[in-house]
Amino acid sequence: MTKLAQWLWGLAILGSTWAALTTGALGLELPLSCQEVLWPLPAYLLVSAGCYALGTVGYRVATFHDCEDAARELQSQIQEARADLARRGLRF
């Protein structure tokens, strides 16, 4: 099972549970305070996931390390590829 399928199954289970609880399909009588929290729960979860993603990307960008050796190696490979393509008649 791919990661996408796992996420979709998880979202389907959470969504169906939320829908069943909010519509009363299970026959449970939830207190009014629980119902008031339950209705906007998907929006809260979406905003929380967005904040987590933004924080993770920001942290990874802030702690990104330069790979100077790999950059030099890549530049030399690019030069070799350009020279090979120039020998084969490709003009840049």
UniProtKB/Swiss-Prot annotation:
One of its GO terms (biological process) is dolichol metabolic process. It comes from the Eukaryota. It is a multi-pass membrane protein. Keywords: Endoplasmic reticulum, Membrane, Transmembrane, Transmembrane helix. Pathway: Protein modification; protein glycosylation. It is found in: Endoplasmic reticulum membrane. One of its GO terms (molecular function) is enzyme activator activity. The keyword Oxidoreductase does not apply. Belongs to the DPM3 family. Stabilizer subunit of the dolichol-phosphate mannose (DPM) synthase complex; tethers catalytic subunit DPM1 to the endoplasmic reticulum. Component of the dolichol-phosphate mannose (DPM) synthase complex composed of DPM1, DPM2 and DPM3; within the complex, associates with DPM1 via its C-terminal domain and with DPM2 via its N-terminal portion. This interaction stabilizes DPM1 protein. This is Dolichol-phosphate mannosyltransferase subunit 3. It comes from Pongo abelii.
